[in-house]
């Protein structure tokens, strides 16, 4: 079974809550992936005497969901029940536990749960080779503890700007690369042994079996980085998200986007849903999960922002009417054609961060569809099939490259760039099925085993190349001793 579906699963899981002066909302979507491997934790009021503390986390699983799901249920108890963390509770007496004790307790909790899961029969005998990143925050009355293991990410938005961001654990980072090489491994095509795209994770026991090395010295380490930050009145919100979100939006883009949505809605689930929908349209082909935690100083619904949203709706209504009237003599255009025209225009009052196409398609599609249906009540199709076909073709192209990687490891990224360029050119020239032709070319290049010169494409999106970087890490199969 391939890594991608023919069409994305867009149903969302949502939750929200409040307590300890915080509000949170979350959203997760399977998207184009064959399986949903993300998980999350949201606890307001930590047991064992820390009721004024809260804990939130996102887990991005790969090669299966076993590890991510277990961690979402049990990581917090492994943290709070270990001796180091209990010592933290005792050391502070009536005051907040010391920062160093809390950090040591969190670190010990990660190592303990990783050691504990290794004894699961399916993980021990290799029947399940899954692993998971983990990014979280533990919020006390005085501090915010940011916790990261892998390439999911957390950001803090304070005083109208990104104040802090965790650092992704990638094999190409110098410190991570040094540890991998000291354990006898290598970093090829920005992956551990040419296969795994993260250098720290829970699970992934195939990469944690080097004799004479401790758990934090293995090819893949379960040790988290823990950062503490003093809370401030200016704190607005924290975002936790997997790389399915960060692959297509930068820290600043996402925070500005969230800020703009909080100014028109106080429903945090809706805000998170807007993020996920926008990332899907911007090209993310991974599972997508986001947890949004708002402090009391978070942006509030604004009359000015609501007015701009209303003006945007009116503008789009008039533009759809104009497009339909101009096309009347040549026949009624389909909805996808109308969307493409609008996506190429410089439309006023769009929220920041989503990009023109992303904002129009997902924020105001209902407005556009309503006008279109009124002017064309007998339409046979809403044009969505065209969008699905285009995205599905790109998925087939990436899957063909994944299969080709078995026979052509050294050059697959260059080949992906060439195939994507070929795909775009074919679309411009009007070929009927450019994805199949590109996939055939990929197969031909793989058989020949020749080096393909890298071609530049000025329209290349970040997610195009990120797709192949992510599509092999969760396949859960083995070939020549490497996970594909």
UniProtKB/Swiss-Prot annotation:
Binding sites annotated in the UniProt record for Mn(2+) 1? 60-61
**How would you classify this enzyme at the top EC level?**
hydrolase
**Which cofactors, by name?**
Mg(2+); Mn(2+)
Where are residues bearing Phosphoserine located in the sequence? 391
Q: Where is this region: Disordered?
A: 1-20, 431-484
Kindly give the membrane topology term recorded for this protein: Lipid-anchor
Q: Which residues form the PPM-type phosphatase domain?
A: 23-295
Keywords linked to the UniProt accession:
Cytoplasm, Hydrolase, Isopeptide bond, Lipoprotein, Magnesium, Manganese, Membrane, Metal-binding, Myristate, Phosphoprotein, Protein phosphatase, Ubl conjugation
Task: Report the EC code(s) recorded for this entry.
Answer: 3.1.3.16
Cite a single Pfam family from the UniProt record: PP2C
Polar residues bias spans: 440-456
Q: Where is the composition biased (Basic and acidic residues)?
A: 1-14
Explain how, and how many, cofactor molecules are bound. Answer: Binds 2 magnesium or manganese ions per subunit.
Could you describe the post-translational modifications of this protein?
A: Isgylation negatively regulates its activity.
Where it sits in the cell: the answer is: Cytoplasm, Cytosol; Membrane
Q: Which InterPro entries match?
A: PP2C, PP2C_BS, PP2C_C, PP2C_C_sf, PPM-type-like_dom_sf, PPM-type_phosphatase-like_dom
Q: What does the record give as the reaction this protein catalyses? A: O-phospho-L-seryl-[protein] + H2O = L-seryl-[protein] + phosphate; O-phospho-L-threonyl-[protein] + H2O = L-threonyl-[protein] + phosphate
> Which residues are involved in binding Mn(2+) 2?
60, 243, 286
Which GO molecular function, any one, fits this protein according to its record? magnesium ion binding
Role, per record: Enzyme with a broad specificity. Dephosphorylates PRKAA1 and PRKAA2. Inhibits TBK1-mediated antiviral signaling by dephosphorylating it at 'Ser-172'. Plays an important role in the termination of TNF-alpha-mediated NF-kappa-B activation through dephosphorylating and inactivating IKBKB/IKKB.
Q: What is this protein called?
A: Protein phosphatase 1B
């Amino acid at each position: 079974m391939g890594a991608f579906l023919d069409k994305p699963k867009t149903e969302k899981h949502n939750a929200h809550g409040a307590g300890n002066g915080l509000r949170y909302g979350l959203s997760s979507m399977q998207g184009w992936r064959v399986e949903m491997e993300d998980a999350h934790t949201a606890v307001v009021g930590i047991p064992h005497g820390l009721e004024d503390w809260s804990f939130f986390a996102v887990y991005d699983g790969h090669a299966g969901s076993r590890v991510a799901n277990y961690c979402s249920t049990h990581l917090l108890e492994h943290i709070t029940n270990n001796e180091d963390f209990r010592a933290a509770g005792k050391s502070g007496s009536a005051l907040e536990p010391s920062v160093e004790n809390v950090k040591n307790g969190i670190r010990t909790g990660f190592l303990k749960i990783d050691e504990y899961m290794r004894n699961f029969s399916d993980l021990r005998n290799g029947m399940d080779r899954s692993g998971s990143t983990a990014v979280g925050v533990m919020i006390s009355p005085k501090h915010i503890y940011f916790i990261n293991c892998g390439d999911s990410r957390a950001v803090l938005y304070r005083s109208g700007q990104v104040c802090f961001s965790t650092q992704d654990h990638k094999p190409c980072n110098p410190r991570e690369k040094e540890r991998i090489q000291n354990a006898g491994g290598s970093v090829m095509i920005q992956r551990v042994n040419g296969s795994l795209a993260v250098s720290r994770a829970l699970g992934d026991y195939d990469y944690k079996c080097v004799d004479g090395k401790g758990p934090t010295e293995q090819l893949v380490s379960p040790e988290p980085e823990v950062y503490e930050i003093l809370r401030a009145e200016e704190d607005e919100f924290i975002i936790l998200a997997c790389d399915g979100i960060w692959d297509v939006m930068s820290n600043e883009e996402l925070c500005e986007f969230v800020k703009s949505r909080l100014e028109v809605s106080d429903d945090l689930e809706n805000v998170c849903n807007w993020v996920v929908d926008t990332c899907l349209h911007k090209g993310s082909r991974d599972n997508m999960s986001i947890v949004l935690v708002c402090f009391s100083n978070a942006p509030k619904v604004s009359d000015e922002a609501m007015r701009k949203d209303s003006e945007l709706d009116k503008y789009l209504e008039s533009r759809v009417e104009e497009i339909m009237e101009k096309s009347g003599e040549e026949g009624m255009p389909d909805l996808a054609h109308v969307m493409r025209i609008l996506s190429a225009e410089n439309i006023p009052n769009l929220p920041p961060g989503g990009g023109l196409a992303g904002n129009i398609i997902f924020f105001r599609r209902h407005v556009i569809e309503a006008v279109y249906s009124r002017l064309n009540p007998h339409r046979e199709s809403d044009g969505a099939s065209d969008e699905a076909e285009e995205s599905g073709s790109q998925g087939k192209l990436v899957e063909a490259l994944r299969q080709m990687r078995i026979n052509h490891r050294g050059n697959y990224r260059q080949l992906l760039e060439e195939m994507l360029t070929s795909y775009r050119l074919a679309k411009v020239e009007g070929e009927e099925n450019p994805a199949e032709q590109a996939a055939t070319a990929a197969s031909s290049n793989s058989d020949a085993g020749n080096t393909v010169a890298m071609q530049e494409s000025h329209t290349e999106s970040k997610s195009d190349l990120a797709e192949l970087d992510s599509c092999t890490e969760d396949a859960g199969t083995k070939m020549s001793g490497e996970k594909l």
